[in-house]
Amino acid sequence: MAKLQITLTRSVIGRPETQRKTVEALGLKKTNSSVVVEDNPAIRGQINKVRHLLTVEEK
Protein backbone atom coordinates (compact mmCIF):
# COMPACT_ATOMS: atom_id res chain seq x y z
CA MET A 1 0.00 0.00 0.00
CA ALA A 2 1.02 3.58 -0.55
CA LYS A 3 2.01 5.85 2.28
CA LEU A 4 0.91 9.43 2.86
CA GLN A 5 2.86 12.17 4.59
CA ILE A 6 0.40 14.48 6.32
CA THR A 7 1.51 17.89 7.63
CA LEU A 8 -0.61 20.21 9.78
CA THR A 9 -0.12 23.57 8.05
CA ARG A 10 -2.82 25.62 9.81
CA SER A 11 -3.67 25.93 13.48
CA VAL A 12 -6.69 24.28 15.07
CA ILE A 13 -7.31 27.33 17.28
CA GLY A 14 -10.88 28.51 16.78
CA ARG A 15 -11.90 25.35 14.90
CA PRO A 16 -14.86 23.17 15.91
CA GLU A 17 -14.20 20.37 18.38
CA THR A 18 -14.85 17.70 15.73
CA GLN A 19 -12.05 19.09 13.56
CA ARG A 20 -9.68 19.25 16.55
CA LYS A 21 -10.41 15.60 17.40
CA THR A 22 -9.88 14.54 13.78
CA VAL A 23 -6.48 16.25 13.65
CA GLU A 24 -5.55 14.59 16.95
CA ALA A 25 -6.71 11.19 15.64
CA LEU A 26 -4.38 11.60 12.66
CA GLY A 27 -1.50 11.93 15.15
CA LEU A 28 -0.85 15.64 14.62
CA LYS A 29 -0.27 17.90 17.60
CA LYS A 30 1.42 21.15 16.62
CA THR A 31 1.48 23.26 13.48
CA ASN A 32 4.07 21.97 10.98
CA SER A 33 4.14 18.52 12.61
CA SER A 34 4.09 15.58 10.18
CA VAL A 35 3.16 11.91 10.23
CA VAL A 36 3.50 9.12 7.67
CA VAL A 37 0.48 6.82 7.52
CA GLU A 38 -0.83 3.99 5.34
CA ASP A 39 -3.24 5.09 2.61
CA ASN A 40 -6.67 3.58 3.30
CA PRO A 41 -10.29 4.76 3.08
CA ALA A 42 -10.53 5.59 6.80
CA ILE A 43 -7.48 7.87 6.68
CA ARG A 44 -8.72 9.46 3.42
CA GLY A 45 -12.04 10.26 5.11
CA GLN A 46 -10.28 11.95 8.02
CA ILE A 47 -8.08 13.93 5.62
CA ASN A 48 -11.14 15.11 3.66
CA LYS A 49 -12.79 16.31 6.86
CA VAL A 50 -9.91 18.70 7.67
CA ARG A 51 -8.24 19.11 4.26
CA HIS A 52 -8.21 22.92 4.64
CA LEU A 53 -5.75 22.52 7.56
CA LEU A 54 -3.42 19.92 6.00
CA THR A 55 -0.88 19.32 3.29
CA VAL A 56 -0.78 15.74 1.96
CA GLU A 57 2.01 14.16 -0.10
CA GLU A 58 2.29 10.61 -1.41
CA LYS A 59 5.42 8.71 -0.41
UniProtKB/Swiss-Prot annotation:
Superkingdom classification of source: Bacteria
Q: Does the keyword Ribosomal protein apply?
A: yes
Q: Gene for this protein?
A: rpmD
This protein's assembly is summarised as: Part of the 50S ribosomal subunit.
Q: Which keywords label this protein?
A: Ribonucleoprotein, Ribosomal protein
GO molecular function terms attached to this record = structural constituent of ribosome
Q: Which family does it belong to?
A: Belongs to the universal ribosomal protein uL30 family.
Q: Which GO terms describe its biological process?
A: translation
One matching Pfam family: Ribosomal_L30
List the Gene3D superfamilies hit by this protein, alphabetically: Ribosomal protein L30, ferredoxin-like fold domain (3.30.1390.20)
Provide the coiled-coil residue spans: none
The scientific name of the source species is: Staphylococcus haemolyticus (strain JCSC1435)
The Gene Ontology CC terms held by the record are: cytosolic large ribosomal subunit
Its protein name is: Large ribosomal subunit protein uL30
